[in-house]
C-alpha cells in the first residue's frame, strides 16, 4: 500500500496547538498571537489576537473558539462563526481558561477554568449558550484539575481530568465514573464522538483498563491491557491502542481484530478506517486496522 501526502502548509509557530474537526483544522500558536483555520488543502483564514493565546478549539460547523490572556480580566474567550465574525465573548475575571470545546451545532461552548483561593487551586467547568451572556450551567470540581471538555451527541458533555471522568446530559445532569481506585491516563474522542479512555489500574504504569463509550455516553465495552499505553485512538468502527511494542485494534464489541509489532519509538496512533497510523520522530507508519497482515502497510518519512 502507499500513503499519499494531501498537502503541506508551513507555519512558524513555536508552540503549535492543532485541533481538527470534520475536515477543518485550527492551528494556534500557544503563547503567541496568531491562529489559522485550514481545510485539507489550503489556509481558509488567518487571525491575530491582542493578547497571548492559551487554548483553542473548532466545532464541526466551523465555529472556532480562542482563549487568550485577559484584557482587564484573567482570561478572555472569543468565539467566531465560520465566516470569522465574532458571535460571543466572555471575560473570566479571576481564573485561567484551560480547555474549550464547541458543540456540533455551534451553539454551545464548554470551558474549563482553574483559579486559586486561600492558597488552594480549584477547577470548574462552565457551559455557555451563545444566546446568553452568562453561563447556563456550572460545575465545581474542587482541586481536581479538568484538562479536557468534549461535546458528544447534542449537549451531552464529557469532562475529564486525572481523577475525573464525568458525563453531563441536558446541561445539568452530571454522572461521575468512580475513579477512586484508578486514574485517567489517555483519552480519545472521534469525529463522530465515540470515546476511548485508558485508566491506570490502581495507579499502575503497566496495568491498564480500556473503556469505550458511544456518543450518548453509554459504555460499549471494557478490556484489560497488560502493558503501558502510549496512545489510544478511535473512529466510528475501531479502537486502537499503542504500547511500547504493539499496536492492538478492537471492534466496537471489544473483540481484538488485529495486532501488529511496532518499533519502540512510536509516539502516537491515529485510527482512520482501513488504516491506523503510528507517528514517530522520523516517520509515519500505516498498519491495517482489520488484519494482522504485514504486507498491507506503508511508511512516510519526514523528508518525503
Stretch-by-stretch model annotation:
Residues 73-166:
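Solenoidal tandem-repeat scaffolds enriched in leucines and small polar residues
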Residues 4-10, 41-48, 85-91, 133-140, ...:
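A short beta-strand motif characteristic of beta-propeller blades
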Residues 205, 210-304:
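Hydrophilic extracytoplasmic domains
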Residues 11-22, 51-60, 94-103, 141-154, ...:
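Repeated scaffold domains used in trafficking and secretory/extracellular systems
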Residues 25, 63-65, 106-109, 156-157, ...:
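Hydrophobic beta-strand positions that form the internal "hydrophobic ladder"
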Residues 28, 66-68, 111-112, 159-161, ...:
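Residue-level marker for isolated small/hydroxyl-bearing positions within beta-strands
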Residues 33-37, 72-78, 117-127, 163-169, ...:
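Structural motif
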Residues 5-115:
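Non-cytosolic head/periplasmic domains of membrane-anchored proteins
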Amino acid at each position: 500500500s502507499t500513503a499519499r501526502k494531501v498537502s503541506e502548509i508551513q507555519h512558524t509557530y513555536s508552540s503549535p496547538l492543532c485541533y481538527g474537526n470534520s475536515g477543518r483544522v485550527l492551528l494556534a500558536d500557544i503563547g503567541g498571537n496568531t491562529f489559522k483555520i485550514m481545510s485539507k488543502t489550503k489556509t481558509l483564514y488567518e487571525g491575530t489576537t491582542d493578547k497571548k493565546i492559551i487554548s483553542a478549539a473548532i466545532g464541526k460547523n466551523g465555529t472556532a473558539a480562542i482563549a487568550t490572556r485577559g484584557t482587564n480580566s484573567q482570561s478572555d474567550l472569543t468565539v467566531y462563526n465560520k465566516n470569522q465574525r465574532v458571535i460571543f465573548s466572555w471575560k473570566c475575571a479571576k481564573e485561567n481558561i484551560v480547555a474549550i470545546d464547541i458543540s456540533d451545532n455551534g451553539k454551545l461552548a464548554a470551558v474549563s477554568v482553574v483559579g486559586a483561593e486561600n492558597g488552594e487551586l480549584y477547577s470548574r467547568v462552565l457551559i455557555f449558550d451563545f444566546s446568553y451572556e452568562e453561563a447556563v450551567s456550572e460545575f465545581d470540581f474542587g482541586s481536581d484539575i479538568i484538562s479536557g471538555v468534549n461535546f458528544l451527541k447534542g449537549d451531552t458533555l464529557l469532562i475529564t481530568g486525572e481523577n475525573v471522568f464525568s458525563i453531563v446530559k441536558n446541561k445539568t445532569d452530571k454522572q461521575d465514573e468512580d475513579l477512586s481506585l484508578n486514574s485517567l491516563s489517555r483519552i480519545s474522542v472521534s469525529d463522530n464522538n465515540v470515546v476511548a479512555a485508558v485508566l491506570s489500574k490502581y495507579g499502575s504504569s503497566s496495568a491498564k483498563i480500556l473503556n469505550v463509550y458511544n456518543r450518548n455516553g453509554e459504555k460499549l465495552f471494557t478490556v484489560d491491557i497488560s502493558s503501558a499505553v502510549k496512545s489510544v485512538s478511535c473512529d466510528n468502527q475501531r479502537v486502537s491502542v499503542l504500547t511500547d511494542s504493539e499496536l492492538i485494534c478492537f471492534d466496537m464489541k471489544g473483540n481484538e481484530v488485529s495486532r501488529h509489532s511496532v518499533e519502540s519509538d512510536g509516539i502516537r496512533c491515529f485510527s482512520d478506517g482501513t488504516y491506523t497510523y503510528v507517528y514517530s520522530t522520523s516517520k509515519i507508519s500505516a498498519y491495517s486496522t482489520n488484519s494482522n497482515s504485514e504486507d498491507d502497510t506503508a511508511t512516510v518519512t519526514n523528508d518525503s
